[in-house]
Amino acid sequence: MRYLFFLMVGVLASHAAAQSPKPAAENAKPIQDNSFLLEEAYNQEAAVVQHISALIFDRTIHTWLYAFTDEWPVNGQRHQLSVTIPLQNSVVGKSAALGDVALNYRLQLVGSGETRLAVAPRLTLLFPTAAKEIGRGNGGLGFQGALASSYMATPTLALHSNAGITVQPSVETGVGGSAALTDFNVGQSAIWLIHPRLNLMLEGMLTNAESFTGVGTNRTRSTGITVAPGFRWAYNFPSGLQIVPGLAFPIGFSANSGQRGVFLYLSFEHEMPGLRK
């Protein structure tokens, strides 16, 4: 489930812009946020916060990973902070436990959810809150950098591109020492806005992960591919609250071959008047 953990952190770390409260006449505006395996390049709008729950279950090996993310804008839309708290059951026979908590900062570098092109880099600090001795976590701090871009190819087709790197400087080797591991990921998605409140989604992610071979600090690399068809829909309320459920079916190829998952998603977005300047 290691590939699932980094996918979840990468996506939920800085997920997407919320739809701020709008008059009823504007409620039909197409949703742009709430991807699953990728992130869009839209920060939260000023004074709008987002609470995200995501659960992925691998039907082949009967493991699951849950993650809760809270996103908050900082003095407007340009800066955003968020925290991701994962709960995982990644080792057969072990009970669920806390994973490595992620603290994230993202900059709205170019554009926004209102422009055709948007770009947003992200920095993430992974805290070693997981228990290594029960098969979770890596025993040390981790760092993640990512770049997301979003492009509206047509009024009903959104394209999102991601690239990222995760560095873990001090991972326990299992033979009394530690060494660094580095992972890379790239991703692409296409979102079809078939209705103002219903989107069809096709997401793909390639992850190149480094691991120890089991003999000292010798390393090996594996490349896994995940493709996930899915859909999402939105409920908009007069108060400005937006609820977005979603469902996808991740399929693994290459190093992830044989993995078949079910991805459940639920987001709540609303305004916090106290954050208004």
Where are these predicted regions, by residue range?
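Positively charged n-region of N-terminal signal peptides that target proteins for export
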Residues: 1-4
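Small-residue packing motifs within transmembrane alpha-helices
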Residues: 6-10
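N-terminal signal peptide c-region/cleavage motif recognized by signal peptidases
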Residues: 13-15
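Transmembrane beta-barrel domains of Gram-negative outer membranes and organellar outer membranes
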Residues: 19-277
